[in-house]
């Protein structure tokens, strides 16, 4: 509809003004809480309809709290001095170096040489390469943009027609390996840190790199094995004979020998991952490890000041920060306590039992994705809605972050998932049919719930469920 953004913006502002100045403050809620609630309503409308860039909406939301007297500046913007923000900045810097030097592409192509040059073999290769590379780059868009052209080259070499079974299957295999497995590793995407940052401090402490990985092992196994059989069942061509690996060999030859910059980047990232895994042993915060790693890469001229300015998605970093600020401010303004009383009848049955939670919550998130496009916005809305109930859950709120990050990845309809749109644009929208996308998404949604259910015994052994 023409002028949709303008209309949505006006509606959002009007609702915010009405809630702030004209609706009497309900019993049990302070005026500061009303201001935060009003800003949240306005911001969500702006985010859903993309009225202005998301990061600008977030900054205006935080500023409104200060201007209208809900909280002081130091409280509103406190999130930008936390370790979570700096691990995101450092992680994105490491990922930028891995992409710039060609290290990621080399690793992916090298892995593919070990598998048969047919549909089954290259599907498995894309799964394997993506899973290995996932924790190295904490941003979905570069991974999807890099992996789908590789899948297209393989598809062409195997003689698959655009939008056919084989082409669709390899496109989805690239996304499955490089994008879907992001939920398996804390460092694989900035949104993992965003959802973690909304949790209470105790729950955040439970979600270090090693614990996250262990918590997700059963889910990862289900997603990889189930995903492989799903894609081969749906998309394997009738004649799946191996062909020459010439395309992959040619791509590797074009890269030439491993450069000095690649070797330095590989070493720094491997050391960083080791320190992240052993964070509790070395007692060095993950953010410090990431910052030192990026500083070393800059000092050794792998990354330049210009790279640091242009290769990091600063608008995304700021947006994530403004989203994470909501958790602390909602508590400070008393909004979480009030919401807990209001929403208790509807929410309590869902969170009373962990098995009910891991079935019901993903379904709620799937439905939300039809309305809220942004992955981070969807996850934030769900997490904020549950914030008031964290204290009465029969399990650790850390599990909420896990469920949210696995469940926002829905792509039944093309508009639902921006990183997948990026991957599709990288191959000129020439590989997968809409039907193939919908089928694979439904398959993932089912496997996701199964994977989460299988995780519950592990979580119970870890004492968090």
Please report, for each region that a protein language model flagged, where it lies by residue:
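Hydrophobic transmembrane alpha-helices of multi-pass small-molecule transporters
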Residues: 1-87, 211-341, 439, 443-465
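Hydrophobic, membrane-inserted alpha-helices
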Residues: 13-16, 38-45, 126-131, 174-177, ...
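Membrane-embedded alpha-helical segments and adjacent helix-loop junctions characteristic
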Residues: 25, 42, 55-161, 311-393
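Alpha-helical transmembrane segments of integral membrane proteins, especially early/N-terminal helices
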Residues: 45-58, 98, 103-104, 178-193, ...
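Re-entrant/interfacial helical elements at transmembrane boundaries that shape
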Residues: 61, 108-109, 141-156, 171, ...
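Alpha-helical transmembrane segments of multi-pass membrane proteins
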Residues: 88, 120-134, 160-182, 207-215, ...
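Hydrophobic transmembrane alpha-helices of Major Facilitator Superfamily
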Residues: 98, 414-417
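Membrane-core helix-loop-helix motifs of multi-pass transport proteins
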Residues: 153-237, 420-465
């Amino acid at each position: 509809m023409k002028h949709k953004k303008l209309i949505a913006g006006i509606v959002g502002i009007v609702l915010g003004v009405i809630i702030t100045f004209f609706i009497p403050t309900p019993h049990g809620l302070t005026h500061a809480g009303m201001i935060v609630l009003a800003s949240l309503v306005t911001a969500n409308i702006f985010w859903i309809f993309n009225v202005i860039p998301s990061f600008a909406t977030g900054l205006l939301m935080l500023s409104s709290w200060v201007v209208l007297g809900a909280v002081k500046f130091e409280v509103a913007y406190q999130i930008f001095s936390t370790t979570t923000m700096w691990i995101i900045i450092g992680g994105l810097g490491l990922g930028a170096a891995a992409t710039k030097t060609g290290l990621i592409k080399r690793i992916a192509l090298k892995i593919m040489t070990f598998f048969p040059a047919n549909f089954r073999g290259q599907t498995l290769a894309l799964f394997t390469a993506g899973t290995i590379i996932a924790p190295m780059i904490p941003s979905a868009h570069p991974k999807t943009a890099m992996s789908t052209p590789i899948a297209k080259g393989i598809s062409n070499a195997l003689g698959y027609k655009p939008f056919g079974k084989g082409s669709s299957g390899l496109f989805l295999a690239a996304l499955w390996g490089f994008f879907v497995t992001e939920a398996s590793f804390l460092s694989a995407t900035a949104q993992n840190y965003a959802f973690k940052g909304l949790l209470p401090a105790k729950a955040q402490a439970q979600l270090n790199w090693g614990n996250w990985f262990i918590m997700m092992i059963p889910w990862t196994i289900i997603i990889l094995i189930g995903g492989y059989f799903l894609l081969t069942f749906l998309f394997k061509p009738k004649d799946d004979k191996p062909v020459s690996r010439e395309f992959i060999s040619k791509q590797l030859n074009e890269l030439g020998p491993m450069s000095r910059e690649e070797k330095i980047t590989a070493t720094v990232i491997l050391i960083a991952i080791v320190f992240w895994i052993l964070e509790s042993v070395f007692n060095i915060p993950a953010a410090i490890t990431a910052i030192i790693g990026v500083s070393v890469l800059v000092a050794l001229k792998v990354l330049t000041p210009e790279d640091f300015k242009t290769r990091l998605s600063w608008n995304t970093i700021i947006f994530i920060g403004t989203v994470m600020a909501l958790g602390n401010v909602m508590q400070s303004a008393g909004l979480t306590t009030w919401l807990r009383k209001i929403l208790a009848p509807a929410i309590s049955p869902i969170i009373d039992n962990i098995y009910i939670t891991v079935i019901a919550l993903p379904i709620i998130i799937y439905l939300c994705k039809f309305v809220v496009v942004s992955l981070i916005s969807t996850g934030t809305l769900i997490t904020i809605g549950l914030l008031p109930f964290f204290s009465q859950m029969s399990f650790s709120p850390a599990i909420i972050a896990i469920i949210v990050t696995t469940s926002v990845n829905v792509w039944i309809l093309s508009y639902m998932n921006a990183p997948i749109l990026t991957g599709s644009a990288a191959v000129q929208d020439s590989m997968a049919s809409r039907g193939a996308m919908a089928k694979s998404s439904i398959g993932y949604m089912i496997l996701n719930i199964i994977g989460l259910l299988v995780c519950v015994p592990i979580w119970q052994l870890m004492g968090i469920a």
